[in-house]
Curated annotation (Swiss-Prot):
This is Glycerol-3-phosphate acyltransferase. Its EC number is 2.3.1.275. GO terms for cellular component: plasma membrane. GO terms for biological process: phospholipid biosynthetic process. Its main location: membrane. Keywords: Cell inner membrane, Cell membrane, Lipid biosynthesis, Lipid metabolism, Membrane, Phospholipid biosynthesis, Phospholipid metabolism, Transferase, Transmembrane, Transmembrane helix. The keyword Cell membrane applies. It catalyses: an acyl phosphate + sn-glycerol 3-phosphate = a 1-acyl-sn-glycero-3-phosphate + phosphate. The lineage of its organism: Bacteria, Pseudomonadati, Pseudomonadota, Gammaproteobacteria, Alteromonadales. Belongs to the PlsY family. It comes from Shewanella baltica (strain OS155 / ATCC BAA-1091).
Amino acid sequence: MSPLTQTLLMILAAYLAGSISSAVLVCRMRGLPDPRLQGSGNPGATNVLRIGGASSAAMVLFFDMLKGAVPSYLAYLMGIDAVSLGLIAIAACLGHIYPVFFGFKGGKGVATAFGAMAPIGDDLAICLMASWVVLLLISRYSSLAAILTALLAPLYTWWLDDRFTIPVAMLSTLIIIRHKDNIQRLLKGEESKVSRKKRPKKS
C-alpha cells in the first residue's frame, strides 16, 4: 500500500472515529437530556458537566480525547509523516465537529484535538492539561482556557519536540476558529462561566 493510500485511509478512519459523539451517547446511557438541546447546546464535556455532573463529564472527556489519540498514535506507528499526521488529527476533530452519524451537529473539538496531541509525549500532555486546568480555575471560562491552551500548544511542542510543531499549530488554528463565537461573547462580557449541576438538597 502506498503512503498516500495509507494517509487517505487513516484520514477517513479518523473522521469516522471522531463522528462518534461521546456526549450524546453518554447522556443517553445515563438517562440525561440530549446535550444538543440542553444547556449551551454544545455536545461536549463542559456542557455535560452542567447538565449531568462531574462523572458523566469525565466519561465524555476521556472518550473524546481517545477519538483523537488513537488515530494519531496509529498513524505515528505506521510511519506517516508529520504534516500528514496533522491532517489525520484534523480529520478526527472535524468528525467531532461535524459528525456524520449525528446530523453533522457536533462539539468544539477541544478534547479531541488535545487527545491527538497527547501521543507526542507525556510531557506535552501534562503541559496541556495543567495549562487548561489552571486557566479554567482562574477564569472559570472553559472557552477561554481552551483558546489560551491552544495558543500555548505549538510553543510547548516546539520546545519539547519540534518535529510536530506544524501539525500541532494546524490543530490549534482549528480550535481557535471553532471558538470565534465564544471569542465575541468573551469580548462583550456575555460568555457563560462553568458551573456544575447542583444536586437537590435532601429533606
